[in-house]
Amino acid sequence: MLDLRYIRENAEAVKKNCRDRGVEADVDLVVELADRRSALIRELEGLRARQNQLAKAVAKERDERSRGRLIEESRELKGLIPRREEELRGVEERLAEEQLKIPNMTHPEAPVGRDDSENVEIRRWGEAPEFGFEPKDHVELGEALGIIDFDAGAKTTGSKFYFLRGEAVLLELGLVRFALDLLAGRGYELAMTPDLARDRMLLGTGFVPRGPETQIYSVENTDLSLIATAEITLAGQLVDEIVAEESLPRRFAGLSHCFRTEAGAHGRASRGLYRVHQFTKVEMFAFTTPEQSGEMHEEMLSIEEEIFRTLEIPYRVVDICTGDLGAAAYRKYDVEAWMPGRGDYGEVTSTSNTTDYQARRLGIRYRPEGGRPRLLHTLNGTAIAVSRTMIALLENHQREDGSVALPEALVPYVGREVIGPARR
């Protein structure tokens, strides 16, 4: 959420930012509502002060006629103040609703574009493998190896759910432990978060928990929703807190299941594990001072790249354009892995610097030594999204006999060098 004073003082820049992002937000209405709220607050302060003056004056006044006039004025105020308070509540609710529609400002070097087709490639690592045979995609590999069962998932739960079986279970656990070990070695605090969060935490991090546009599963008759990412719970753990500056930056590696409705997702690009309703993810999250956040963003990106280099998976890094940033991100990078099954790159990680956008919504501040509390910055980044990483790993490391050779770094975590054909 942007600061109201900033919106007032930079209304034209905020409007341009909304246009660049393709976001419909009424900046003028927000300014108008903010001004009306300020006017109502001042009016109420004056009315309450006058009410207190009248109470004292009535107690002192001995002239009955004058006393009657004072009592009548006090009675009028007694009716007027609740009406103004009700009006203020309505204005504040509308202001909060409209203010939430305004996205974060954008890094000046982020590319301007309408959608993901205008994201800008920064660099590549690795070469797409050249197979001396007709390669299979991960769905064909998973079924042939007996390790991914989409039919059982559809039967028990619905489409876009799946069972992992046998060596795929070991592979998921190995990927998770590999990522956690790497992050622990870089000073990240390990956390296993709840899979549910209060709606305030979702709204605070920029997600829409309810309504027709939501990608979130919510729990009926509660203020709880299934999380789409541990970013939500990791950010929410410090809601309404003030932390010491010397404790920053704080880095977390959060393990959780993630749940997404993936409404509207279809087509070959969404095949198999690419867009599913539930998956496991290790998420990086950091609280920093404003001065630290740029460097932290680059650190998270470098870790994401290191993970995919270590897994020997070709990838490219893209700078996300304004139309694809989402509400909270000031700047965002994606790592896209080469996926032979689609003959193209597919997103496997994202990392975003959300500056103070989430912190303002969640009331998270830090106190500089000897100073007043200030809003801190928050950042997030995917370490391992298991389902998509599994796609890239199976497809890039497949062999002609239908087996999959695991990269050397994963062997100790999975306990084998090769995932072989299913034994019947």
Swiss-Prot record:
SUPFAM superfamilies: Class II aaRS and biotin synthetases, tRNA-binding arm. The keyword Endoplasmic reticulum does not apply. Keywords: Aminoacyl-tRNA synthetase, ATP-binding, Cytoplasm, Ligase, Nucleotide-binding, Protein biosynthesis. It comes from the Bacteria. It catalyses: tRNA(Ser) + L-serine + ATP = L-seryl-tRNA(Ser) + AMP + diphosphate + H(+); tRNA(Sec) + L-serine + ATP = L-seryl-tRNA(Sec) + AMP + diphosphate + H(+). Consists of two distinct domains, a catalytic core and a N-terminal extension that is involved in tRNA binding. This is Serine--tRNA ligase. It comes from Rubrobacter xylanophilus (strain DSM 9941 / JCM 11954 / NBRC 16129 / PRD-1).
